[in-house]
């Protein structure tokens, strides 16, 4: 659906470049198709960064004024070029982290104009009377800068040295991309960026599913900042999510490490003992995140209602604290060791997920498991129909896991909202009742909570007080329950939205925006970024359906609601020059109106509406007063886009090329450090890794999705039409590799990794081509991962080949580059 807008852009003259290991339908539409070896994106993007710097193709006025290029970094910082592949601060990891190394980022920090003792400031701040006074005491002196960009420790010069060896020749050697194609990409990017033009990067799982996935995206962000393509129409980085409302599931989170609105989850391992400790640890004292106390207190009021009071830290001690790594792989690692007794799986099919064979064996260690889905998926059926049961390794009568399968309503059978990748919250209506016992996730969660509240009602145990005080008032008011349905017991969606949006605690009046939030308990709001979506009774903005007419700019402010504050382009102050004038008339979005003394335009300003461009920063101030009128990036402490990331990333302040955990070749840039030094590896006898250039596993496998299927196939392989469109699992093999292996089209072939072995039909195609990597021929194959052993269309589980290795920032797995062997099946 999204690609129709790409097609429309091409019709209007836009250029489309497609960089991918495989030639796909997107490639066929592209002006330029560029192959590369899977897992080498940072080398490719790093080469583009070097090209823009050395050829002075970067947008200098934007870079100097709107990024931290001019900021000076501490003298003791050392780059990968100084330390042969790692940054300063590398040290051995503590036990239990599933890592060999971690970083101490002290040397990555800005050099300040005066000394600042953060520990001493914290000692004083904790004594302050109010949260605002606490934050004020944590404000550091400003950073040293050199607007000429000549100081050797400026971010610009550090970045220049860091990428100096990412030459077109090095890109060709690492990526296998012909030098001429790479240079054409660089030229096209430069031609389509600057004051008059913008370029957008669009990515999906091809960038994320790596042990350096966050740094892949960081490299693209760095490049876009250099080119002036952030905060402007037609620019930015667009993530194509895996399915509907993935954005919403991180905003109102199903994440283990954050709570609503991207606030950090209270954590027993950090200085989060009290609410004050949490606020001092997590609040950035300058920039908009200085408002964290307002967001957090309002969130706690949404959790505990009248029981949340100033004298009990608004119930902070009742809030659960995480005490370890509860990410996907870590949880199944614990399950494999018998440390988890029960599990819920809503719309999730882990039996076909990463290192699927190990996951299915881990499921057999549970006492009980709840699966809520549309059909009896592989996870629900693992105990009697998995490959391990079929082979006799596991026996159903010996598996103790009791499985509870609850049939789920489908999306057309419920009403609610989706949040898309552009942060638009859109309401959708219900088309029909679900059949039989099928129920929505909201019904299940609501009914479970009501029953648990009854069970805990008489408890006097201190540990249960938080759950007893948890507010749960989502039943319809008497006489208000819908009469056009046979389903009973659904919660009132608009009551849930009241809590998400927020209201004044004493009167119940809905809040019009997050600017009204307070840190004294007078406002209740579950999710500060969604505050304003439901500003008054009868006015639910996600249900708006008023598009711009054709002669308008197309920001569509009357269609749905985009968080925050209905802004359609984040950091849109950057769409105007430092003086507040549009960089370009054809690209103008917001601008400063001196007559009205405010920012005006086609979008809601992502900036203080009345802060003039010539407003100076207030020395020593906290919050937004610390930023001048020329600092668009309001959520960052210095208001500048970060080319160099001093804090927040676990694996370095600049993107650096490392090889995937399994690679056919050594790391040409840094031979001493083959892989990301702080990637997570979950050790298990069934999670072995192939060594560099292992002759038993010489071929690179990348996995992908098909238009006709959805993720593990749980929503598509049961549907006859979709199953007929893509009826069986296949493996794409180049003609050259097929000839070498004696494989014909449609032959059954066996694909084997260090973790597992599967069979599939061969699809011999020139869509994948051999690449020359540092003088060596490297073959790549591709496989879709939608299949499993249940449903109308069945096939082997491709993820049985993958491993439990993860990016250290977000713990995503590496399924886009691994080593396998391919042979004709006997």
Which sequence ranges carry the predicted segments?
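Conserved short loop/turn motifs at secondary-structure junctions
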Residues: 170-177, 203-211, 240-244, 347-352
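Long, contiguous, secondary-structure-rich segments that constitute the structural scaffold
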Residues: 443-499, 595, 600-608, 612-627, ...
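Long, well-ordered, tryptophan-enriched scaffold segments
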Residues: 13, 22-195, 284, 445, ...
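Short beta-alpha connecting loops at secondary-structure transitions
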Residues: 28-36, 380-382, 390-391, 407, ...
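Extended redox/cofactor-interaction regions of prokaryotic respiratory oxidoreductases
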Residues: 1-6, 12-14, 18, 133-143, ...
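A glycine-rich phosphate-binding loop feature that marks nucleotide/adenosyl-phosphate handling sites
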Residues: 65-69, 188-189, 204-206, 236-247, ...
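Glycine/threonine-rich phosphate-binding loop and adjacent beta-strand/alpha-helix elements that clamp
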Residues: 401-434, 449, 785
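Flexible glycine/proline-enriched surface loops and loop-helix/loop-strand junctions
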Residues: 29-30, 151-152, 164-169, 202-207, ...
């Amino acid at each position: 659906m999204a690609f129709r807008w790409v097609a429309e852009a091409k019709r209007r003259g836009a250029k489309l470049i497609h960089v991918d290991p495989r030639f796909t339908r997107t490639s066929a539409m592209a002006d330029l198709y560029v192959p590369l070896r899977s897992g080498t994106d940072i080398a490719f993007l790093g080469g583009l960064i070097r090209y823009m710097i050395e050829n002075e193709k970067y947008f200098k006025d934007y870079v100097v004024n709107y990024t931290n290029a001019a900021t000076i970094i501490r003298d003791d910082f050392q780059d990968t070029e100084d330390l042969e592949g790692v940054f300063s601060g590398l040290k051995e990891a503590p036990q239990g982290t599933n890592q060999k190394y971690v970083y101490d980022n002290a040397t990555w920090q800005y050099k300040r104009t005066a000394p600042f003792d953060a520990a001493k400031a914290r000692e004083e701040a904790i004594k302050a009377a109010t949260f605002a006074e606490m934050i004020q005491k944590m404000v550091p002196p400003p950073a040293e800068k050199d607007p000429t960009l000549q100081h050797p420790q400026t971010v610009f010069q550090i970045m220049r040295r860091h990428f100096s060896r990412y030459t077109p020749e090095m890109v060709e050697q690492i990526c296998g991309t012909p030098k001429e194609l790479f240079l054409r990409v660089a030229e096209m990017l430069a031609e389509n960026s600057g004051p008059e033009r913008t370029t957008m990067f669009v990515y999906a799982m091809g960038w994320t599913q790596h042990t350096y996935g966050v740094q892949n995206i960081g490299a693209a962000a760095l490049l876009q900042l250099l080119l002036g393509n952030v905060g402007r129409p037609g620019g930015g980085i667009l993530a194509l999510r895996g399915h509907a409302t993935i954005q919403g599931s991180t905003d109102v989170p199903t994440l283990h490490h954050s709570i609503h609105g991207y606030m950090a989850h209270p954590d027993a391992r950090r200085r989060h003992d009290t609410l004050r400790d949490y606020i001092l640890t997590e609040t950035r004292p300058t920039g908009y995140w200085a408002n964290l106390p307002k967001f957090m207190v309002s969130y706690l009021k949404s959790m505990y209602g009248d029981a949340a009071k100033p004298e009990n830290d608004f119930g902070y001690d009742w809030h659960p604290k995480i005490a370890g790594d509860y990410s996907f792989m870590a949880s199944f690692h614990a399950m494999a060791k018998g440390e988890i007794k029960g599990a819920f799986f809503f719309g999730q099919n882990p039996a076909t997920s990463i290192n699927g064979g190990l996951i299915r064996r881990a499921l057999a260690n549970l006492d009980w498991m709840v699966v809520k889905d549309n059909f009896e998926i592989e996870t629900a059926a693992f105990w009697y129909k998995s490959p391990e049961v079929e082979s006799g390794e596991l026996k159903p009568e010996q598996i103790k896991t009791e499985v509870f399968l609850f049939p789920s309503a489908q999306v057309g059978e419920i009403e609610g909202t989706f949040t898309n990748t552009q942060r638009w919250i859109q309401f959708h209506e219900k088309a029909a009742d679900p059949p039989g016992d099928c129920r929505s996730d909201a019904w299940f969660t609501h009914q479970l909570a009501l029953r648990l509240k009854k069970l805990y009602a008489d408890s006097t145990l201190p540990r249960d007080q938080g759950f007893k005080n948890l507010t749960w008032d989502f039943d319809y008011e008497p006489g208000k329950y819908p009469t056009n349905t046979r389903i009973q017991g659904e919660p009132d969606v608009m009551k849930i939205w009241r809590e998400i949006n927020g209201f004044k605690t004493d009167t119940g009046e809905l809040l019009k925006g997050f600017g009204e939030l307070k840190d004294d308990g007078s406002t209740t709001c579950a999710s500060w970024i969604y505050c304003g979506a439901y500003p008054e009774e009868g006015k639910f903005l996600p249900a708006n359906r008023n598009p711009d007419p054709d002669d308008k700019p197309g920001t569509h402010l009357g269609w749905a609601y985009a968080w925050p504050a209905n802004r359609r382009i984040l950091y849109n102050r950057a769409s105007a020059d430092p003086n507040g004038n549009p960089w370009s008339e054809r690209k103008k979005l917001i601008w400063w109106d001196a007559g009205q003394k405010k920012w005006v335009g086609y979008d809601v300003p992502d900036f203080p509406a009345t802060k003039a461009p010539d407003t100076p920063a207030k020395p020593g101030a906290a919050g937004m007063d610390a930023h001048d009128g020329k600092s668009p990036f309001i959520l960052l402490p210095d208001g500048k886009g970060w080319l160099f990331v001093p804090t927040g990333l676990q694996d370095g302040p600049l993107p650096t090329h490392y090889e995937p955990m399994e690679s056919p070749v050594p790391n040409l840039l840094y031979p001493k450090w083959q892989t990301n030094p702080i990637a997570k590896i979950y050790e298990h006898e069934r999670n072995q890794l192939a060594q560099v250039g292992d002759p038993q596993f010489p071929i690179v496998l990348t996995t992908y999705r098909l238009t006709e299927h959805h993720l593990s196939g749980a929503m598509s392989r049961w549907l006859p039409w979709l199953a007929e469109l893509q009826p069986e699992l296949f493996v794409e093999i180049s003609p050259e590799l097929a000839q070498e292996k004696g494989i014909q089209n449609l032959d059954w072939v066996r694909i084997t990794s260090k973790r597992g072995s599967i069979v599939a039909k061969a699809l011999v195609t020139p869509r994948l081509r051999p690449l020359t990597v540092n003088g060596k021929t490297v073959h790549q194959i591709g496989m879709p991962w939608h299949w499993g052993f249940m449903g109308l269309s069945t096939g082997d589980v491709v993820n049985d080949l993958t491993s439990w290795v993860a990016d250290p920032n977000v713990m995503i797995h590496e399924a886009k580059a691994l080593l396998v062997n391919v042979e004709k099946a006997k």
